[in-house]
Amino acid sequence: MIRSVVRGFGAALPKRVMTNRDMEAIVDTSDEWIVQRTGIRQRYVAGDDETTASLGEAAARAALANGGLTPADIDLVICATSTPDNTFPATSVNIQNRLGMSHGFAFDVQAVCTGFVYAVTTADAYIRGGLAKRVLVIGAETFSRILDWNDRTTCVLFGDGAGAIILEATEGEGTVADRGVLTAHLRSDGSHKEKLYVDGGPSTTGTVGKLRMEGREVFKYAVGMITDVIQAAFDSTGTTADDLDWLVPHQANRRIIDGSAKKLNIDAAKVVITVDLHGNTSAASIPLALATAAGDGRIKKGDLVMLEAMGGGFTWGAVLLRW
């Protein structure tokens, strides 16, 4: 049985760091308020010379170096983003070009904060279907470009960055002991689209628009949706929270992360937290967290790892893999 095994990982962050103290100078907020409600202490903000594609390229090159590969070894590039450099061509094609690739194929996935989970699931399907041997999966965002910096309820939450992994086709035994992606579960419900959205677009306003969010409404649904899809991943593989080595959640809000882990009886020591350092980087948050925890040695070969996210739409999903 073909499995999609993680061959390499990487991350990239903008040069500029904005702390909560910096945010106090922009809007009516405080470090105490932000930390208490979100767990965020700082975030990275892209400069004029940094774009979604440039950050994605840097993360991709880091993943290639980590995996001992070159761009010539990649068959497919998938980039999850809601903040593309252009309406078209796709950011993935831009990154492909930046990497010097003129072979293979590339496309973007847009599922907001769940984008990386969708992208990993898509890459796994291409690998298992025999259409690609190695897939570069990137989550890259510059959410600072779509924030209303006068809206204190949203501008303090988001940051910029990129993360990447390389999935490689590897022969497995077809059991949960295999390395690689074991199962994936994706969901969406468009009836919630007005709770988290951007108030612009090419075919409606002809503008980029700004992010708008009904924070309390999103919070109300988040824990239930996240835990349901994680449980589905456990059930489909015959595993439990006790078997899990690491939960790598979308880094949106510390209270949502803690609430989800508690509901599923997942030990807090097994949860990777980077929201304090990066803020909510949408589709980039999970690969950034993966790169952090794998880079410092916490996530090791053979570990059972759960990825989960929820985003605008609503979209939500989970991927269970063995590192």
Swiss-Prot record:
Record: active site: 113, 250, 280
One Pfam annotation, family name? Answer: ACP_syn_III_C
Q: A single GO molecular function, which one?
A: beta-ketoacyl-acyl-carrier-protein synthase III activity
Q: Which reaction does it catalyse?
A: malonyl-[ACP] + acetyl-CoA + H(+) = 3-oxobutanoyl-[ACP] + CO2 + CoA
Q: What is its EC number?
A: 2.3.1.180
The subcellular location is:
Cytoplasm
Q: What is this protein's record name?
A: Beta-ketoacyl-[acyl-carrier-protein] synthase III
